[in-house]
Amino acid sequence: MLKNYKLKAFALLLLAGSVLGSCDYLDIAPAEIMTEDKIFQDITLAQQDLGSMYHDIIKWTALNSDDRLLRDGPFTWTGCAGDESIDHWGTTAPTTYFKLGGLTTGYNPLGDWSWNYALVRKATNFINKIEGVPLTQSQQQTYGTKVKQFKQEARFLRAYMYFDLLRQYGAVPLITEVQDIADISGAQVPRDPVNKIVDFICSELDEAASVLPDTWSDDTNYGRISKAACLALKARTLLYAASPLYNGNTMYKDVKNLDGTQLFPQTYD
């Protein structure tokens, strides 16, 4: 009896040891998981990363609550918010809340704060790293000039995100470096004045326009950012900046940072 007990105990110890020893495989990162280091070691992956930013300009959420798609695209959010049409989502639709005055600081489907800043971070990281991607000799011939264009396309996309923030919120934090996600205090950035945001957007678009072609010649580049797109967005940004909403609007005279910085210009320019 004692002998059988010892044999069972020994077998259990062996089994436990084999199970614990086999857990090492869990420490290996799955090959299909893409990391930032992998992306910026391969020009093809880096180009795909840029493509994903083009995709992210549109907030691909539920169509009934997607602000950019409904505000600027083929769907008309304002049509459903008025009496022109009825949202098929019924009483749960954001447009219904809009009609009834139900939008609050806690529920605002038109707000893109997190989405925009996520893309700002992604574009900034791309701008900082794309020129460091190693290229083979054959890739140098293909991508030598394109890398500079990739960088400026990302610069445009970042400027567009700030334009979108400007037209929604006016003065916003201007973040031009990739923040450390572990540094909570460093993430607490105050808002910058409207004029500073406008100047930044225009400066970024000028730089991008100086590198990108006037237009793209072949259909494979259809939809890519061009010099014309940069100048068009700059013109629209300046139009917003010159509007009574932002230019000398005294309704915003008390909108200041804690240090007293005036966030909206109070004199008409």
Please annotate each region the language model reported:
Residues 166-167, 173, 216, 240-249:
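Short coil/turn linking the two alpha-helices of tandem helical-hairpin repeats
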Residues 249-268:
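A solvent-exposed, charged loop/short amphipathic helix patch at secondary-structure junctions
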Residues 1-31:
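Bacterial Sec-dependent N-terminal signal peptides
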Residues 23-76, 256:
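Membrane-proximal, proline-rich intrinsically disordered regions
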Residues 223-233:
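Amphipathic alpha-helical protein-interaction segments enriched in hydrophobic
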Residues 31, 65-69, 171-175, 247-250:
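Outer-membrane beta-barrel and related beta-rich outer-membrane complex signature
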Residues 42, 47-63, 87-169, 185-199, ...:
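Conserved, well-structured interaction surfaces
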